[in-house]
Amino acid sequence: QFDANIIETKSVQWNAGINISHNKSKILDLAGDEMIGDDDYGALKYIKGEKLFTFYLRDYQGVDPETGNAMWMDKNGELTNRVSQARYIKAGSPEPTVTGGFHTDVTWNGITLNVQLEGKFGNKVLIAENNYVQSDGYQMSMNQSASAMNYWKQPGDTNCNPKPVARNSTSSNTSTSTRYMENGSYVRIKDVTLSYSLPKRWLSPVGVNNLKVYASGMNVYTFHDVDYFDPERGVKGMGYGIYPMTKSFVFGLDVTF
């Protein structure tokens, strides 16, 4: 952690600070086992020598450009369209490698701007909800996401979802695969507050000691690449149906007599 007063004059004050932490965990022993499971949809494992939580998932390899079927890597390193033959791989951890924050306050002639940022880096998240809303035809009674419409339509199509088939007998939408895994790193503008304190010489004649007007926003914006409302998915990186962080905006008046 580092804090500094950058400018300190009668009319201008500016300070800023940053904090960074490195997170590291390792499972040393599992009472003789090399790996044991976790209850969360079978997606997480406790693996000796790895971080506390490790995603252990079927190895999804995209869409066959000729047929539109989902492809998987099998134990022999060969591609297959049968999910039952897909190999399982260690696919990263929901634990961030680095977490940090930044804050700064600038005051000029009674006007103050306060900004706070926070971030996490190096973690993976599993958007398990997508097996419902990008179901490739399995969830026929449920609305699908806009991204589900980007599916295979003709030979040669790539970088898309598998072709939708009624009831999806191929199980391409299984939640325990790398298909719905994403980089969970993000930077969030956690708080922005702009305030103005009226000069005391204006207030003294009316018996007011201090008067400040302000506007504040929380969770203003988040920079991330996760195909979901919010990249924060809980300690296990899944948080099935987790409610996203709420944005709030406040305008206020603070008066002291």
Q: Where do the PLM segments sit?
A:
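Membrane-embedded beta-strand positions in outer-membrane beta-barrel channels/transporters
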Residues: 1, 15-17, 101-103, 191-195, ...
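Conserved small-residue
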Residues: 5-94, 134, 144, 151-153
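Transmembrane beta-strands of outer-membrane beta-barrel pores
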Residues: 6-8, 20-26, 108-110, 119-123, ...
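Outer-membrane beta-barrel proteins
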Residues: 11-13, 25-31, 65, 70, ...
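Residues that define the transmembrane beta-barrel architecture of outer-membrane proteins
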Residues: 12, 96-100, 185-190, 245-249
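Transmembrane beta-strands of outer-membrane beta-barrel proteins
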Residues: 14-16, 102, 108, 113-115, ...
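C-terminal beta-signal and terminal closure region of outer-membrane beta-barrel proteins
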Residues: 40-67, 144-157, 161, 172-176, ...
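Extracytoplasmic gating/loop element in the C-terminal half of outer-membrane beta-barrel translocons
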Residues: 120-212, 217
